[in-house]
Amino acid sequence: MPSEFSESRRVPKIPHGQGGSVAIPTDQQEQLSCPRCESTNTKFCYYNNYNFSQPRHFCKSCRRYWTHGGTLRDIPVGGVSRKSSKRSRTYSSAATTSVVGSRNFPLQATPVLFPQSSSNGGITTAKGSASSFYGGFSSLINYNAAVSRNGPGGGFNGPDAFGLGLGHGSYYEDVRYGQGITVWPFSSGATDAATTTSHIAQIPATWQFEGQESKVGFVSGDYVA
C-alpha cells in the first residue's frame, strides 16, 4: 500500500517508445477535484498502464484513487476503509458463530418396551415394569391405607410387599448400618383411598435399625413398615 509520502516523491514515468524528449502534460500537475467527495486536496500519482490518457490521481480527503477516463469503483483501494471492512466481516462471522453455537438441539429418547405378562382380573401387567411392584403406585396407596386402618399404625412397604421375592428369613429382615437405632413412624391417620382386597397381609408399621459402632453386619430388627 503506497503511503502519501512515497507517492509525493514518485516521479511520473514516461511511456515506452516515446523517448526522453516528451514532456509531461501540464494539466496533470494541477490539483483536480475528487469526483467522489469533490475535494481539491488531491494529487497526481502516475499514469495507468503507462498511458497518458489514463492519469491516476489520489484524494487525500476520502483516501481513494481514481483514473481519468475510467469508471469509479465502489471497492476501496487502500486507506482506512479497507480496515473497517475487515472489522465488519470479523464481527459478522463472530455473530454467526455465536448464533449457531447457542442453538439447542433436542435429544432423541429411545423408548423402552416391556413384554406383556398375564392378565389378572382384567388388568394386564408387564414384566420388569413399575406396575409389577405390587400393582403400581395406586396399589401402594391402597395397601398403606389398609395397614393404617387395621394395624397399629401406617407405614411404608417392605421389600416383600413389592414382589421382590425377599420374604422373612432372608438377610433383609435384619439390617445393621452402624448408626444406632432409627425408627421411621408413619401417620396412622391416613384415609382409605380405594377398596382393599382380602389377600393383603398385615405387617408392622415402622422401620427400625439398631446397631453398634464397633460391628458391621445384620442384627435383629424390623425392616418393613
Swiss-Prot record:
Cellular compartments per GO CC: nucleus
Keyword tags: DNA-binding, Metal-binding, Nucleus, Transcription, Transcription regulation, Zinc, Zinc-finger
Nucleus among keywords: yes
Pfam family, one: Zn_ribbon_Dof
Gene Ontology biological process terms in this record: regulation of DNA-templated transcription
Predominant subcellular localization, coarse grouping: nucleus
ZnF (Dof-type) ranges: 32-86
Residue positions binding Zn(2+): C34, C37, C59, C62
Region (Disordered): 1-27
InterPro entries: Dof (IPR045174), Znf_Dof (IPR003851)
Amino acid composition bias (Basic and acidic residues), ranges on this chain: 1-10
Molecular function, one GO term: zinc ion binding
Residues that span the membrane, as ranges: none
Subcellular localization: Nucleus
Function field: Transcription factor that binds specifically to a 5'-AA[AG]G-3' consensus core sequence.
UniProt cross-references to PANTHER family, sorted A to Z: DOF ZINC FINGER PROTEIN DOF1.4-RELATED, DOF ZINC FINGER PROTEIN DOF5.8
UniProt name for this protein: Dof zinc finger protein DOF5.8
Gene source species: Arabidopsis thaliana
Native organism taxonomy: Eukaryota, Viridiplantae, Streptophyta, Embryophyta, Tracheophyta
Gene transcribed to yield this protein: DOF5.8
